[in-house]
Amino acid sequence: MGHADGVTRRQADLTLLLATFLWGTTFAVVKGALASATPLAFLTLRFSIAALLLAPGTRFRPPPAGRELRGGLLLGALVAVGFITQTAGLVITTASRSAFIVAISSVLAPVIALALLGQRPGWLTAAALGMATLGIYLLTAPDAGGLNRGDLLTLVCAACFGAQIVAVTELGREYDARRLVWFQVAGTAIVSACALLLLERPRIHWSGAFLAALAYSVVFASTTCFLLQMSAQRHMSSARAALIFCFEPLFAALTSWLVLGERLAMLQWLGGGLIVLGMIAADLPASRAAAAGP
């Protein structure tokens, strides 16, 4: 089935899957960068450069007003808090665990859509939440090191990203996608800089490896991925988008194994698998309903 602007459902799915792959690979990259920089210093650099790169192609006139302005500020706040808590959590927890916990945002998205927009995701959501909760327990059980502060920060990140999935779906159909992306990126840069001044004693060790990680994070995770997400989600429901995001922790775990040598125990893989199954159970019925629409 095609869309008014010529984008097919399959093209939209593949576009979002590419963004999901790139975001999945970023966990290991950022984990490596945090050996050379404090979290807020890294985020401030990453998103400030990304905002500058996006600015030339962004239309700032007419200036945003009303619902677009409120939506842009909301997106900026959600992404800022999400990335700050995710990056701070990565200092403490592993990239693989972080990716599986962040992926719970896909389970939370239908719940948030129900709470805020009255969009009923179906009875499987409760079962999916139960599976995800059990998955978190197995992933962070005492034998696996227990639930640490990094995991808790990452849970906050998952809630923010779940809300962002819903907000992008609602706002992306009405307003200029690139401008909304710039709101998210610039908002994260500003909030990170303010938090840096208040909460952190910044440290950056400049090296070739750090610059490569920064460049990868800026070009792919902070600009390309957001543009791909905004472009793709104009043509799908938040539930369908959340279903595609289910692949992110798998990409992240594979990259963390290849790049960082991280390995999960069998019980942790079982926990991660339950989280992914929970996401699929929560999102697939609504995604099928959207695909069978008029």
Which residues does each PLM region occupy?
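Helix-helix packing/entry segments at the starts of transmembrane helices
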Residues: L43-L45, S98-I104, A167-I190, S222-L258
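Transmembrane alpha-helical segments that form core, pore/gating elements
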Residues: A28-V29, A50-L54, A109-P110, G146-E200, ...
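C-terminal-most transmembrane helix of multi-pass membrane proteins
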Residues: G2, L14, R46-F47, I136, ...
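C-terminal transmembrane-helix exit sites in multi-pass transporters
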Residues: L53-P62, Q86, S105-A127, D143, ...
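Hydrophobic transmembrane alpha-helices of multi-pass small-molecule transport proteins
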Residues: L54, L73-L75, V79, P121-A141, ...
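Hydrophobic/aromatic residues within transmembrane alpha-helices
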Residues: A33, F42, R46, G89, ...
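Specific transmembrane alpha-helical segments of multi-pass solute transporters/efflux pumps
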Residues: L22, T26-F27, A55-V102, A109-P110, ...
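Glycine-/small-residue-enriched transmembrane alpha-helix faces in small-molecule transporters
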Residues: M1-A41, A77, T85, D143-E170, ...
